[in-house]
Structure formats: structure tokens, C-alpha cells
Amino acid sequence: MPRKRHTRLVSQPTPISIQEILYTTRAMRRLRTDPVPDAVIARILDSGLRAPSGGNTQDWRFMIVTDRDKIAAIAPLYQAGLAQLFEGHYKQANAATRAAMASGTADRRTAQLGRVLDSSEHLAAHFADVPLLVFGYLTSRENAGSIWPALWSMCLAARAEGVGSTVTTILEMFAAKEVDEILGVPDGSGFYRHACLPMGYPTGRWGVPDRKPVSKVVYHDTWGTPPAFAPSEPLWSLHG
């Protein structure tokens, strides 16, 4: 039975700074089952559509899915796709990470990867309970550059609303046709799906994710030369 949608006007959340949005928007794969109200979804979508596209063509379509039966039908496709990914491209890294975690020899980066693997498996196991999916389509199969700014803007807008999100292409890699059939996308529509954003209120807390510092990944004028001003630690934190 479809879950009843929230149609009442939902007040906007307490504003947070752009720095907090940028620094704390990270992959949130552990989501509560609470529905995301329609008014919140509308703000996320409307904000995301302000993003640029190549030539301002806006040759995109976005599909939002809240129907419980459709999400339940998509869930096993996502689970099978993740299993294929873990048994294929990520098989060696997955096995090595699991072994290091089990033996207590994991370093900081390995432990971080272990948490990513755990949260990815959690999302797959609970995919049928995700309250909101956002799919991004373009008229181009190869040139996805025009869809990513809008999708990421939606992730940022979701963060401003207290809604967690993550970007995944597993369904596009392993179940493109099957998902389109579930969603009623006609053959020959001329649109190609590029990514899925599972969204929902997170079970955990927001925080600044562990990332390599500017000084390690940015060069200035010459390859291999970092900027003299490059910080080695985040310039912003939740604690000021």
C-alpha cells in the first residue's frame, strides 16, 4: 500500500552557513524510514535545477520515486548490482579491507574504506525502506557532464534541509533497462539515466568527512608543486 504523502506546508529549517553545507555534505547511506515531506522535496528539486548545464540546454529529466512498491521492486536490483561490484572490480580491495579490519591491523585509510563498505552494504540491505529516490536523465548517453552539477546541487540543498543523500550509479551500471521498466520510461524516450540519489533523514550525525588535504592534491602553476598557501587541515569545523 502506498505510504501517505505529506502535503502540508513544511516550514524551512533553521538556516545554516554555506560553509557548513559544503563541509558536511557527505555520503549518508544510513537513512531513517520517515517520509520526506513534499514541500521539502520541492525545495530540493527547485534549488537543484538552478545548476548550469552545457549551453544551458537543460536537456534533462528527473524522476522522483516515493512509491513503496516501486522502491521495493528496485531494491533487489540494487542489491544484485552491489554484489556484482564487490565480486568484480572491488573484490581484491574488499577482501583486503575485511581482513585488515578483522585482524585489527587496518590503518586510518583502510578503516575509512571499511566504514564505506559497511554503509554501502547497509544501504543495499535496507534499500526497500529508503523514503525517496531521485534519478537523473539526459538526452546524451556519453556526456554526463551536464547532469552532475544539478544532482550535486540537490545533495547540497538536501543537506540544508537536514536530509541525507548519496550518489550511486550501480543501478545504471547493472540494471538500466529493468529500472526504466519499473518507472514506466518508454523505449525510445531519448533519455538516458545517469545516477540515482537515495535520500532520507539520516540516522547518524553530520560531520566534516575525512579527506586528503589541499596540500596533497593541488598543484600551482607546475605539476607536483603545491601552492605555498595550501592548508594541510580543514579551514572550517563544526566547532568553530
Would you name each region that the model predicts?
Residues 58, 64-145:
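Glycine/small-residue-rich phosphate/adenosyl-binding loop
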Residues 30-32, 61, 165-169:
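Short catalytic-loop micro-motif centered on adjacent basic/acidic residues
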Residues 51-56:
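Glycine-rich phosphate/pyrophosphate-binding beta-alpha loops
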Residues 7-14, 192-240:
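C-terminal helix-cap and adjacent tail motif
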Residues 41-46:
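Short amphipathic alpha-helical segments
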Residues 83-97, 183-210:
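A glycine-rich helix N-cap at a beta->alpha junction
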